[in-house]
Amino acid sequence: MKPVNDTEHWDVIIVGGGIMGCSAAYYMSRAGLRVLLFERDTPGSAQSGRNLGFVRQQARDFREVPLAMGAIRLWQDLERDLDRKLGWYQGGNIVLALSEDDIAQQFAWQKEAQGYGLDTQILSAAQVAGKLPGLAPGSNVLGAMFTASDGRAEPAQATRAFLDAAVEHGAEVILGQRVSKLETAAGAITGVRCAGRLYRAKTVICAAGAKSAALLRSLGIVLPQEIIRATVAKTEPLVVPFPHCVSCPMTGIRQAADGSLHLSVAGGEYDVRMDSVRYARWYMKVRKEQPEASRINYLSPLRGILSRGAPPPLADIPPTSDCVPPNPTRIEQALTETTDFFPAFSNLRVRASWAGYIDTLPDMIPAIGPVSTTGGLLVATGFSGHGFGLGPMVGRVLSQLIQGKQPGADISQFSPERFG
């Protein structure tokens, strides 16, 4: 990547090298816009490169479904469009049902999904067994929800592919540098400040994941963003294919391109930090209604002080400057539930594990789009652990908005200003 001269002027500056920022950089540079992207670590080093790798429409908040359906259409051709391997495989997504209440909820979701033209089916127990031949006979599975058009991809590989393709189209990149401020004048964006230097652009996309709220706060924008530390484990490779992404009651299972299984338990650790007090009122209802969703870690400030650094780097996971240790208890929970449902996996060993910070918002849907009080500023953050699959479509929509085109999906309900 060539050196960047801060005396120049760009059409668009993107803060954040996750899949949202990298896909936006690709679609905009392909359209001929001059793009500069900042990433404080390496591309995909936060949650974009550390998630489970599901690419799904199924079981989403219906406000996200049009985005998810548009994203699937893009994923189907991305390896050709980017001219790179992404580990894309369209094997469908299965959510197991273990009670009559589960079945009722799945039928209700499927009925509404039909109005969107989604191909979701409700499977009987026998049909589930046919799709998952290794399922334990005594697993008490009554049925499942299945969407055949859902798929999977390799998170870090896909994120990097978008950035590399963007660079081929002329995008410029600054890695290892943190943007400290969004600069404005007369109510409009003028650029960003990094390492004391001003980089100029009339349009800026803030896609900085868990760091977005702090950047926006200096402009008076309220974004009550919190972070959850989620853990993923990787097993040794299977000798047989496991084509579907599967959601057990608590554990998600995906087979990676190298044959290994990636496992993750729903929820994670809520690491208490300074912003926890600032945003507490926004999350009281969520924590009361979903106490199992995250475990509060009151000692997290000490973790950063006492730690000697982040866990050792892994070959296929981008390194990060954050100290984000995986939780061994979560790994054990994931292994236990996986082998309960699939006894043939009982001898699989965990080869690696990692964690990443999920940036969340109180209503569990993202903030996407322009900020009316600051001309030229757009936001893409708060994807609450289910943004990876949306990434291509979000990048394309941001590109369309900046070019003055009609966006390919309605994002009016994702306003970054909805929290006041």
Protein language model features and the residues they cover:
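C-terminal lid/capping helical subdomain adjacent to the catalytic/cofactor pocket in oxidative enzymes
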Residues: K2-W10, A31, I122, W354, ...
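N-terminal Rossmann-like FAD-binding beta1-loop-alpha1 element of flavoenzymes
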Residues: V12-L36
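Flavin-dependent oxidoreductases
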Residues: S23, L182-I305, I317-P328, Q333-F341, ...
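Glycine-rich FAD pyrophosphate-binding loop
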Residues: R30-S48
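Glycine-rich phosphate/pyrophosphate-binding beta-alpha loops
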Residues: L52-F54, R60, D150-R152, Y357-D359, ...
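Dinucleotide-binding Rossmann-like beta1-alpha1 core, especially the glycine-rich loop
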Residues: G53-K131, G252, S260, Y270-V272, ...
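Flavin (FAD/FMN) cofactor-binding and adjacent substrate-gating region
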Residues: D77, L98-L175, K181-A188, E289-A310
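FAD-binding beta-loop-beta segment adjacent to the flavin cofactor pocket
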Residues: G130-P137, P328, T339-T381, H386
